[in-house]
Amino acid sequence: MSIKPLHDRVVVKPIEADEVSAGGIVIPDSAKEKSTKGEVVAIGAGKPLDNGSLRAPVVKVGDKVIYGQYAGSSYKSEGVEYKVLREDDILAVIG
């Protein structure tokens, strides 16, 4: 992947939901909810502040995160779907 996010943007590779429920039922694509979990694969330099400095990103590459269902923009590269989010759209870091 060759994408470098700007400023406080973060590129996340969504983690797909399970194909089979806990009870063993296969879940079709049409019934799956959009993923809201993913792994950070790239981060920008940080959020520009009013005084001209940058606030360093809190997340780092490799972090597993939870983000809002409708947050960010989708980007597809080499058949892989990514989300480009603002760091503020990330709700939590998992683990």
Curated annotation (Swiss-Prot):
GO cellular component: cytoplasm
Keywords for the protein's UniProt record, in alphabetical order: Chaperone, Cytoplasm
GO biological process terms, semicolon-separated: chaperone cofactor-dependent protein refolding
UniProt keyword annotation of DNA-binding present: no
Claim: Cytoplasm is one of the keywords in the record: yes
Domain of life: Bacteria
Entry's Gene Ontology molecular function annotations: ATP binding; metal ion binding; protein folding chaperone; protein-folding chaperone binding; unfolded protein binding
Location relative to the cell: Cytoplasm
Complex formation: Heptamer of 7 subunits arranged in a ring. Interacts with the chaperonin GroEL.
Family as reported in the entry's similarity comment: Belongs to the GroES chaperonin family.
PANTHER family: 10 KDA HEAT SHOCK PROTEIN, CO-CHAPERONIN GROES
HAMAP family listed in its UniProt record: CH10
Job description of the protein: Together with the chaperonin GroEL, plays an essential role in assisting protein folding. The GroEL-GroES system forms a nano-cage that allows encapsulation of the non-native substrate proteins and provides a physical environment optimized to promote and accelerate protein folding. GroES binds to the apical surface of the GroEL ring, thereby capping the opening of the GroEL channel.
Name of this protein: Co-chaperonin GroES
Organism from which the protein derives: Xanthomonas campestris pv. campestris (strain ATCC 33913 / DSM 3586 / NCPPB 528 / LMG 568 / P 25)
Record lineage: Bacteria, Pseudomonadati, Pseudomonadota, Gammaproteobacteria, Lysobacterales
Name of the gene: groES
